[in-house]
Amino acid sequence: VKFIVAQNYQRYLWWCREQNPPLNPRGPEVRYVTDARVLRGLSNINYLCLNGWMDRPDWRDIYHELLIRGGRQA
């Protein structure tokens, strides 16, 4: 999780803002994540990174599509 947050922190912040209600991350130094939504979100972002989709300008749309389909579980 630390690696994912460090590598994609801006995308992580974007993801946190997208949640309802929004999550308020304290920063990349947070080591223990217990909120299931955070774990699922980071897992989804990592999944997109592993598949190279984060390099695409429409990665947010792909992420939302993944979320709609149930996401990639943490």
Stretches with model-predicted labels:
Residues 1-74:
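Short, flexible loop motifs at catalytic/binding sites
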